[in-house]
A protein has these predicted regions:
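Residue position within the beta-strands of beta-propeller blades
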Residues: 65-66, 118-120, 180, 219-220, ...
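Short, solvent-exposed loop/turn segments at conserved positions within beta-propeller repeat blades
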Residues: 72-78, 125-135, 181, 222-227
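C-terminal motif of bacterial Sec signal peptides marking the signal peptidase cleavage site
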Residues: 15-18
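Repeated scaffold domains used in trafficking and secretory/extracellular systems
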Residues: 50-58, 101-112, 160-173, 203-212, ...
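Bacterial signal peptide processing site
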Residues: 20-22
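Short loop/turn segments that connect beta-strands within beta-propeller blades
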Residues: 85-89, 142-147, 189-194, 234-238, ...
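Beta-strand-rich domains and repeat architectures in extracellular enzymes and scaffolds
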Residues: 43-79
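A short beta-strand motif characteristic of beta-propeller blades
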Residues: 39-47, 90-98, 148-161, 194-200, ...
Length: 289
């Protein structure tokens, strides 16, 4: 059996009660302020298959993820989409399975109704060639029962710029619109998957993208001077909005999501941070080391 540990995208707050003060009051009769520390919570997954997990995203009280499975006996592989309940710890595989022999999922998101959104790829081998020579990229939307609600081939759009022809990450706003990042370009698609335009970032490298507590989508990137910046993506204006400073370097992890106390949670190789847009201030919540 293979044990795989997943660090949950959420963190657990643990109260540090004052020594001998179970009622929460101090000797002066004043209510004592409790202190909190955040610690990572881990989920142990035992599998009988050769599996790897990715594309973890939290929506409501569920953690969604993709599970790449390889069957050693048959030599076949597939991608299964799973969900873990943050309230009762139950797990389920959704009725959505992607054939991973020559394809897979670039990125995945979920909405409050349990719909699943994916950017999927497939390599098509040209007859006589040993290697896969052509790639298709398709946006999909599935409901919780596994029914496909939308499929939009965006291959031609992605191939218009050979320097930005891949899906780095995908994000959804509160209107179900798609934001797809590549090396230095953000492509925008409506909720129906139709291309709406692109945002040129003039960036050396896009670090990550995520929806903040305000429901808007933000982009972390290196500017031309090599400094890490954060900007809101203006979908309607097809441009970057206000720029924010003092943003932590995610080292390409792309780990941005809605914050708890402030606007954004930011994950890096070594720590988890809380970021305030109003103060442009970064606070370390916990260390992964």
């Amino acid at each position: 059996r293979k044990a795989t540990a997943i660090a949950l995208a959420s963190v657990m707050a643990m109260s540090l009660a004052a020594c001998g003060k179970q009622d929460g009051s101090n000797q002066g009769g004043q209510t004592e302020q409790k202190e909190y520390v955040y610690v990572p919570e881990y989920l142990e997954l035992d599998d009988n298959t050769n599996s790897s997990y990715s594309n973890m995203t939290v929506q409501g009280d569920k953690l969604y993820y993709t599970n790449y499975q390889w069957d050693e006996a048959s030599g076949e592989s597939k991608v299964v989409i799973g969900a873990y309940s943050l309230t009762d710890g139950s797990r389920e595989d959704l009725p959505i399975t992607i054939n991973a022999d020559g394809g897979g999922i670039y990125s995945m998101q979920a909405d409050a109704e349990g719909n699943i959104y994916t950017a999927e790829f497939e390599w098509n081998a040209t007859e006589g060639d040993d290697a896969y020579t052509q790639q298709t990229t398709v946006l999909h939307k599935y409901d919780a029962s596994g029914t496909e609600l939308m499929a939009q081939d965006i291959t031609d759009i992605m191939q218009q710029d050979e320097n930005n022809s891949y899906v780095g990450s995908m994000c959804l706003d509160d209107q179900g619109r798609f934001y797809i990042s590549s090396d230095s370009l953000i492509r925008l698609f409506g909720s129906d998957g139709q291309f709406q335009g692109a945002v040129q970032t003039d960036s050396q490298w896009i670090q990550g993208m995520g929806k903040a507590k305000d429901g808007k989508v933000y982009l972390a990137y290196y500017d031309q001077s090599g400094n890490v910046k954060l900007s809101q993506i203006d979908f309607d204006g097809k441009a970057l909005g206000q720029t924010y400073d003092n943003f932590p370097n995610t080292n390409g992890n792309g780990g941005l999501c809605a914050g708890i106390d402030n606007d954004l949670l930011v994950n890096t190789d070594t720590a988890l941070y809380d970021y305030s847009l109003a103060d442009q201030k970064t606070t370390e919540i916990l260390s992964w080391l």
